């Protein structure tokens, strides 16, 4: 059996293929109802069905809104607020670098060790890892070997921040931002009756027992 195709046969095959392509390209598809299962060649169903459904999703009508528009993804999805974050209220704190809101809080910087200079394509990953390690170690309080003395230590526990305090209190929160090789930290206080959210937020007291300021945040507002 001859396995070679003659030149005139090649021209006929190309012409036939072009005619088939032009036939389908010139025939407009009005909707999914114009495509029956028996008329679709196996293997091309997702392409043929996806095209009209894409048009129906982008230009929905009253009869198509609902279950049909939810069946197949159109590639454009709206942002959905997680249920755990919805309704928590409070004022969202912007990027720690610009967190000068006037509501209290302090911005500090944890500088990168100049002797450690990672290079290569993973430089930013290594710097971020080092910054996180320094932040974790910064807020770990070492065991005391002597009698505690009266001192102000940001982030330490206080009488008004104990969860079992019936008078309410504050808890210290931190928001971290990696900016040009430095870790920027914004820290502030929230009432202990307020929810703990993933996004940095200022909350107001809901129980009526939390003080306006505590010994942790009294210096966040500057000198009296």
Curated annotation (Swiss-Prot):
Residues at which Zn(2+) 2 binds: 193, 205, 207, 210
Bias type Polar residues, positions: 54-65
Gene3D superfamilies (UniProt xref): 4.10.80.340
Entry's localization field: Virion; Host cytoplasm
Keywords of the record: Host cytoplasm, Host-virus interaction, Inhibition of host innate immune response by virus, Inhibition of host interferon signaling pathway by virus, Inhibition of host MDA5 by virus, Inhibition of host RLR pathway by virus, Inhibition of host STAT1 by virus, Inhibition of host STAT2 by virus, Interferon antiviral system evasion, Metal-binding, Viral immunoevasion, Virion, Zinc
GO cellular component, one term: host cell cytoplasm
GO biological process: symbiont-mediated suppression of host cytoplasmic pattern recognition receptor signaling pathway via inhibition of MDA-5 activity; symbiont-mediated suppression of host JAK-STAT cascade via inhibition of STAT1 activity; symbiont-mediated suppression of host JAK-STAT cascade via inhibition of STAT2 activity; symbiont-mediated suppression of host type I interferon-mediated signaling pathway
Cross-referenced InterPro entries: Paramyx_V_Zn-bd
Keyword Zinc: yes
Keyword Metal-binding: yes
UniProt-annotated binding residues for Zn(2+) 1: 170, 189, 214, 217
Region listing for Disordered, in residue ranges: 54-94, 150-172
UniProt GO molecular function: metal ion binding
Principal cellular location given in the protein's record: virion
UniProt family annotation: Belongs to the paramyxoviruses V protein family.
Subunit structure: Interacts with host IFIH1/MDA5 and DHX58/LGP2. Forms with host DDB1, CUL4A, STAT1, STAT2 and STAT3 the mumps virus V-dependent complex (VDC).
Function: Plays an essential role in the inhibition of host immune response. Prevents the establishment of cellular antiviral state by blocking interferon-alpha/beta (IFN-alpha/beta) production and signaling pathway. Interacts with host IFIH1/MDA5 and DHX58/LGP2 to inhibit the transduction pathway involved in the activation of IFN-beta promoter, thus protecting the virus against cell antiviral state. Blocks the type I and II interferon signaling pathways by interacting with host STAT1, STAT2 and STAT3, and mediating their ubiquitination and subsequent proteasomal degradation.
Protein's UniProt name: Non-structural protein V
Species whose genome carries this gene: Mumps virus (strain Enders)
